[in-house]
Regions:
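Sec-dependent N-terminal signal peptides
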Residues: 6-16
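C-terminal motif of bacterial Sec signal peptides marking the signal peptidase cleavage site
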Residues: 19-23
């Protein structure tokens, strides 16, 4: 992730510190206005850094005290379905059965980021190159050593060690798992036939860890590890991230230009507002192939419709100013317009 790694590390460190200070000191500096309302949300850990940064501004602008628990996309879908929270968040759209169970929920694509493939391999440097089929075979248990010729051929000039590969995957229901497995399903017939795509799948090889923070910790502690993780968490934890070959045969890191290029190639949103952008076509030059929208999931008939409209209007508008600090690309204009119509339908 060479093009802007050092800049992003500095930005994300400062932004996370500011978010943490505001969360710990809710009544400090500018907190004279009383909170008028509250919203509780849960779900995607990918979007959590953005949501935490939104809290103080939403409180100042709208008097809304926002609480959010990054329990994973699967947990967020379940929580909003049972109405134990006011909104859910997921990097995966609802399946037809989930949409039926959620009873009148709508999707609002409110953030745009990527799932990275991080590794802990001393001597490999910051610019390891991988292809989708190679990644699939690692997690299928077919490639088990970093010195395998299929990896070394992609990285000429690197002296990759004879080190066992330790794959790491999400053990909880995860939108990162959905993005990662959706990509592998597109590029690997063996993965499509044997595993498929979903927020929870049976990964043939490796160790499961809970949440992005759990995956980051396991990779950090395990020499030879490789795992998929929200790029914001990879940067926060100073993990190396591979460049992945896209459909245009370019090796692209999960940085802001690569994410934005993937979004530019998006097709027409589906009727449920979902916008798949994994494995964009070869015409999408410079696109990172595991980019993803992440969605707020909101009941149209919520008793807190006013507060939800305020949150979502802020998130797709002024809240996008935080995007680059957390390795999110800003929402395309056409997605913002789609969201405005959806937000107006709430309540």
């Amino acid at each position: 992730m060479n093009r802007d790694r050092h800049t992003i590390v500095a930005l994300i460190g400062s932004a996370l510190l500011a978010a943490a200070l505001s969360a710990c000191g809710g009544s400090g500096g500018g907190g004279s206005e009383e909170t008028k309302a509250s919203l509780d949300g849960a779900g995607s850990s990918l979007v959590d850094p953005m949501v935490q940064a939104w809290k103080p501004e939403l409180r100042d602008r709208s008097g809304i005290d926002l609480s959010y628990s990054p329990i994973g996309s699967g947990g967020g879908i379940q929580a909003i379905t049972t109405r134990t929270v006011d909104f859910g968040a997921s990097d995966a759209p609802l399946t037809p059965d989930q949409a039926d169970a959620c009873k009148g929920c709508v999707l609002v694509p409110w953030a745009l980021s990527a799932t990275g493939v991080s590794y802990n391999l001393p001597g490999a440097g910051d610019d390891l190159k991988l292809t989708g089929p190679v990644i699939a075979d690692i997690f299928l248990g077919k490639i088990t050593n970093w010195s395998d010729s299929r990896i070394t051929q992609l990285n000429p000039g690197k002296d990759l060690p004879s080190q066992a590969i330790s794959p790491v995957y999400r053990s909880d229901g995860s939108g990162d798992t959905y993005a990662f497995t959706s990509y592998l399903t597109e590029v690997s017939p063996a993965w499509k036939e044997n595993v498929g795509a979903g927020t929870t799948v049976n990964v043939p090889a490796g160790t499961g860890s809970k949440g992005n923070s759990g995956v980051a910790g396991t990779i950090t502690r395990t020499e030879g590890a490789v795992g998929y993780i929200s790029v914001a968490y990879a940067v926060q934890n100073k993990l190396r991230v591979a460049s992945i070959q896209n459909a245009a045969a370019e090796f692209v890191p999960p940085d802001l230009p690569g994410i934005a290029a993937a979004a530019e190639a998006m097709g027409t949103p589906k009727p449920d507002n979902s916008i798949p952008i994994v494995d964009p076509p070869a015409s999408a030059k410079g696109a990172y192939p595991i980019s993803t929208f992440t969605y707020a999931i909101v009941p149209k008939d919520s008793p807190k419709a006013d507060e939800l409209r305020a949150l979502l209007t802020y998130a797709i508008g002024p809240g996008q100013e935080f995007a680059e600090q957390f390795v999110f690309a800003k929402l395309p204009a056409e997605v913002v317009e789609l969201n405005k119509k959806t937000i107006a339908s709430i309540g």
